[in-house]
């Protein structure tokens, strides 16, 4: 359930809302004081209204709005959408086609745009946008009509086969529901996020052995899939290498969830590296299946 995944970051979203509410209360007091005293002192400067920050970006937003939200959140954002055609419909519209922004954000490449209201030129130097979608094969085809424009290779896919099984929804009497469990994990994610925000920049590295295993696997995979599917699939293999590295990075940070201070240099634990590689090998098989259906 995609809604459960959202629970993992919902506490961070709520923290953003709380901080914005505090900023607005402070702004309203400053504005009231300004209105009372501006006639007495011509040198008074009007307070600037704070802009809301949000981690989770609505997928049906216009391109300009998506970039604006990213800009106001230091270039970071997430999207959760249970219907893949929501994003596909936005991409097919005149106002909402930000698929180029998706492609750039994957590699943290700069995105620039103009604010309509004040004609301000804005640059997102290192955008970081992650998206989680669920949908049917037809919805994927409407979102990514071809596999050559670069958007396909920037997604990872997990294909869930249909099973004709009726689940007994009354079968569990456990006090802790799965929603409650994910709520608890979400609070732990918030704590980890807060600790990371308070630490200096952290460098993540693989060991020499891990690098050798990584290069050996993807070198072989590149030739295997090239012989199997041709040139167009190579971008997916190569970007899967970067995705695998990022998965290993996330797993390494989750291992340190109870730490209060983080070292400036973190080496990947062997278990986390092996898990990332296993996940990657499964994902590339699913990516191959989706690629074959779209081609």
Walk through the language-model features, giving the residues of each.
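Phosphate-handling catalytic cores of nucleic-acid transaction enzymes
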Residues: 1-295
């Amino acid at each position: 359930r995609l809604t459960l995944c959202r629970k993992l970051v919902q506490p961070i979203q709520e923290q953003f809302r709380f901080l914005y509410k505090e900023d607005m209360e402070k702004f309203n007091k400053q504005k009231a004081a300004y209105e009372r005293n501006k006639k007495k002192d011509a040198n008074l400067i009007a307070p600037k209204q704070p802009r809301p920050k949000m981690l989770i970006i609505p997928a049906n937003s216009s391109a300009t709005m998506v970039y604006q939200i990213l800009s106001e959140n230091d270039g970071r954002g997430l999207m959760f959408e249970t219907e893949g055609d929501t994003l596909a419909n936005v991409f097919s519209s005149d106002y909402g086609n930000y698929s180029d922004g998706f492609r750039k954000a994957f590699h943290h490449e700069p995105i620039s745009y103009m604010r309509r209201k004040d004609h301000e030129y804005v640059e997102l130097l290192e955008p970081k946008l992650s998206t989680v979608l669920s949908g049917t094969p037809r919805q994927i085809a409407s979102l990514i009509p071809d596999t050559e424009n670069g958007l396909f290779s920037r997604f990872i896919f997990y294909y869930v086969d249909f099973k004709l099984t009726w689940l007994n929804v009354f079968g569990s009497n456990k006090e802790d529901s799965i929603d409650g469990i994910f709520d608890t994990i979400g609070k732990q994610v918030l704590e980890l996020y807060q600790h990371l925000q308070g630490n200096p920049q952290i460098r993540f590295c693989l060991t020499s052995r891990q690098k050798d295993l990584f290069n050996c696997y993807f070198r072989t995979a590149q030739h295997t899939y090239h012989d199997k599917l041709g040139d167009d699939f190579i971008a997916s293999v190569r970007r899967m290498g970067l995705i695998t590295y990022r998965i290993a990075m996330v797993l390494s940070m989750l291992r340190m969830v109870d730490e209060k201070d983080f070292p400036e240099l973190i080496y990947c634990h062997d278990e986390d590296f092996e898990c990332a590689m296993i996940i990657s090998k499964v994902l590339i098989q699913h990516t191959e299946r989706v690629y074959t259906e779209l081609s």
